[in-house]
UniProtKB/Swiss-Prot annotation:
CDD domains: S4. NCBIfam families: PRK05327.1, rpsD_bact. Residues 97-160 form the S4 RNA-binding domain. It comes from Mesoplasma florum (strain ATCC 33453 / NBRC 100688 / NCTC 11704 / L1). It comes from the Bacteria. One of the primary rRNA binding proteins, it binds directly to 16S rRNA where it nucleates assembly of the body of the 30S subunit. GO terms for molecular function: rRNA binding; structural constituent of ribosome. The gene is rpsD. This is Small ribosomal subunit protein uS4. Keywords: Ribonucleoprotein, Ribosomal protein, RNA-binding, rRNA-binding. GO terms for biological process: ribosomal small subunit biogenesis; translation. Gene3D superfamilies: Ribosomal Protein S4 Delta 41, Chain A, domain 1, RNA-binding S4 domain. It holds the Pfam family S4.
């Protein structure tokens, strides 16, 4: 299944959920409660079944991290093999530990999609070595740096200037465009609008 590349705002509005986690998709006077379409479809949509709620939660988080269904499902399967902890939390921690997400959290890109492009194009170093795999699982203590040739890039400078992230599991040296994945995040540090229990229910039926 291909990765969605359409309008971020349109998709965010459909889910009533800020994909960028800062509400900027709704900053042009549009309300997040409005569903795309002529009049938000019909009101029956509000009375969602358990199956529908699970599917929607899975879809919105998959879109938030910019992953294909196969990538998302494989990450969940990996989370099921983690010993200890809560499955839903372990799953979110694996998503947060992706290299493209850490680049986004450090503020080197304004969106996860832009962060993924930086990684894909070889503009990111991990522990001093070029790494162009967005799904790479960054480990606590790993250092992440923008390649020297890109350190004067206007888009990266703009992203850093507008970065509003306050998460404490990463630290960034804005002057030198370097950062570190300090530790694994705690559940309360991650998006509290995500109902990971619904995603667990969805995939537990499919992955044994």
């Amino acid at each position: 299944m291909s990765r969605y590349t359409g309008s971020t705002f349109k998709k965010a509005r459909r889910y009533g959920f800020s994909i960028l986690e800062n509400g900027k998709e709704f900053s042009k006077g549009k309300k997040r409660v409005t569903t795309p379409g002529q009049h938000g479809k019909d009101k029956a949509r509000l009375k969602m079944s358990g199956y529908g709620a699970q599917l929607q939660e899975k879809q919105k988080v998959k879109f938030m991290y910019g992953m294909t269904e196969r990538q998302f499902r494989n990450t969940f399967a990996k989370a099921k093999k983690v010993h200890g902890g809560i499955l839903g939390t372990n799953f979110l921690v694996l998503l947060e530990s992706r290299l493209d997400n850490i680049v986004f959290r450090l503020g080197f890109a304004m969106t996860r999609q832009a962060a993924r492009q930086l990684v894909n194009h070889g503009h990111i170093l991990v522990n001093g070595k070029k790494l162009d795999i967005p799904s790479y699982q960054v480990k606590p203590g790993d250092s992440i740096e923008v390649k020297e040739a890109m350190k004067k890039n206007d888009k990266i400078a703009e992203a850093l200037q507008n970065n509003e992230s306050t998460v404490e599991f990463v630290k960034v040296d804005k002057a030198n465009l370097k950062g570190q994945f300090v530790r694994l995040p705690e559940r309360q540090e991650l998006n509290l609008e995500i109902n990971d229990a619904l995603i667990v229910e969805w995939y537990n039926r499919l992955i044994k």
